[in-house]
Amino acid sequence: MKKLALLFSFFTLALVYQAQAQTSGAVISFKENSIDFGDITQGQQVAHTFVLTNTGKQPLIISNVAATCGCTVPSWPKEPVAPGKSAEIKVSFNSAGKVGKQNSVVRIYSNASEPIEKVSLISNVLNPTN
């Protein structure tokens, strides 16, 4: 019985330590993680700036930001984002050659507790009227 209690205590402490380790690093919080442009005309370019805040206790380092296709181009801060500070990820979408519902996903790779975050640009691309 004592061994069981000791084992239980060990696992409880391990879980608490793991939870503490995960929350003591950088944490990304987005003001919004998607934007819907509604109907746009084929060939139109749209852009949005996603604002993020590092709500963690360590500097946030964004190592890469990647889009699902070449029609979506992100730009992001290359310098660390201090705890409590905000930064911007700017994303543009070129609808040339696209028709119908579009959902361009952008992945943000960082040292945050959740190392991959996603934001998306949603639109419905209409054929141009001649």
Indicate residue ranges for each PLM-predicted region.
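A mature extracytoplasmic/lumenal domain signature
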Residues: 64-66, 93-95, 123-125
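Extracytoplasmic/periplasmic beta-strand context in beta-sandwich domains
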Residues: 63, 104, 117-119
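Short, solvent-exposed loop/turn segments enriched in Ser/Thr/Gly
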Residues: 42-49, 98-105
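Short, surface-exposed loop/turn segments at beta-strand-coil junctions that are enriched for proline
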Residues: 94-100, 111
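Bacterial Sec-dependent N-terminal signal peptides
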Residues: 1-25
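Long, low-complexity ectodomains and other extracytoplasmic segments of secretory-pathway proteins
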Residues: 20-45, 51, 55-57, 113-130
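Surface-exposed binding patches on compact interaction domains or structured appendages
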Residues: 57-88
